[in-house]
Amino acid sequence: MFTSTLLAAATTPLQWSPTVGLIIIIANIIAIAFGKSTIKYPNAEPALPSSNLFGGFGLPALLATTAFGHILGVGAVLGLHNLGRI
């Protein structure tokens, strides 16, 4: 009886699709734009090889903004999946 209750509560897993990738990319762009305006020392050492290509960010700022973007993106993807939109 307990097993049937667990099976009834199980959700369908979300498969990766280009829509999921696009949501993660958009979330990363938003996070980088947010980081560009709020990080106090965006060009802290160690520097990236072509800092102009990365918006003048150093390695710590780039890692921080992309990590934040992935957190935002995963939250958006899981929320939209829970709502049944994707």
UniProtKB/Swiss-Prot annotation:
Its main location: membrane. Keywords: Membrane, Photosynthesis, Photosystem I, Thylakoid, Transmembrane, Transmembrane helix. GO terms for cellular component: photosystem I; plasma membrane-derived thylakoid membrane. The keyword Lipoprotein does not apply. Pfam families: PSI_PSAK. It is found in: Cellular thylakoid membrane. The keyword DNA-binding does not apply. InterPro entries: PSI_centre_PsaK_sf, PSI_PsaG/PsaK, PSI_PsaK, PSI_PsaK_bact. Gene3D superfamilies: Photosystem I PsaK, reaction centre (1.20.860.20). The chain crosses the membrane at residues 14-34, 57-77. GO terms for biological process: photosynthesis. It is a multi-pass membrane protein. It comes from the Bacteria. Belongs to the PsaG/PsaK family. NCBIfam families: PS_I_psaK. This is Photosystem I reaction center subunit PsaK.
